[in-house]
Amino acid sequence: MKAVLLDKPGPPSSLRIGEISIPGPGVDEALVRVCATSLNPVDYKVAAHGYEGWRYPHVLGVDVAGVIETIGEGLVSWNRGDQVFYHTTWRKDGSYAEFNVAPAHTFACIPEGISFVEAATLPCAALTAYCALHRRLHVREGDIVLVHAAAGGVGGFAVQLAKAAKAFVIGTCSASNAKYVRDLGADEVINYRSEDVFQRAKTIAGDRGIDAIIDNIGPGNGVDNLGLLGPEGGLACIAGVPDLSVVPDLPYSISIHDIGLGGVMASPAFRRRQEDLGRMATEVMTLVQVGRIRPTAAEEITLEAIPKALERLAEGHVRGKIVARVQS
């Protein structure tokens, strides 16, 4: 099968297109014909340092939307020909290929009327945002939610999901993305280039503080983020947790969460959490079907164009999701 291959740890520019054998499914697994996959920052981040369990050449990618080709031993819940989408693992060969093998308990159905491209935007970005908001921060109606990097993949879904939960949403982005973020549902938009983000957010929230923060940028803003939280507020860190040794004591109960779906797939011992990926995917797709959120596919490319597109993604400031069509 055709795949995007990594011969050793390195940058996106080191990736190449090549041929490898089609894998076979194990017990309770399925072989899926990949119709579409989307790009995520985790792809180039793990490529840079590699993983001790990888066999090279390695296939990157964690987002799959496709059709079940072959059923593994013991699998009775899915059938050949079913259309599915799911978050696979970066610890084994991933989605930048014509076929992928994964445990079927992570699958969710692609309903009629939803394209493979639309479904492919959801697994990593939408499930990360959904996990942060509904499995960790437990956002409720009336909460004030701050989303950093609101025009990105996770950020865009976080804005939509928070708004679907009837929260008041503040998004940070550049001036060129302000309309896009407002169209996603943000009530207030802060231009991080021309405004003091934390002072403006504090002014918007007032004395009550912010209930939930989704930080897609990195740990450098940790102290400032925590200073915005109100009583029992929470910070969900998508790109690394802050150095807690420099965090001052706060006079109220807060929570800090490190969100990383890839770790859930590290071991069969985490099956309960893996099954929740499938449940979250189904819950997110239901919101798509009823129009509460929409997929954010901003650009469609070919499998061969993935290396160059990953280079652009690594440079930052990509709006929405880049999706590769792999097979029909």
Where are these regions (language model features)?
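Glycine-rich beta-strand-centered segment in the early N-terminal region that forms part
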Residues: 21-38, 48-91
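Short, surface-exposed secondary-structure boundary micro-motifs
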Residues: 35-36, 71-73, 89-90, 105, ...
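NAD(P)H dinucleotide-binding glycine-rich loop of Rossmann-like/cofactor-binding domains
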Residues: 77, 87-149
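Mid-domain Rossmann-like dinucleotide-binding core that forms the NAD(H)/NADP(H) cofactor-binding site
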Residues: 120-122, 126-194
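C-terminal capping/lid region of NAD(P)-dependent oxidoreductase domains
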Residues: 285, 290-299, 307-328
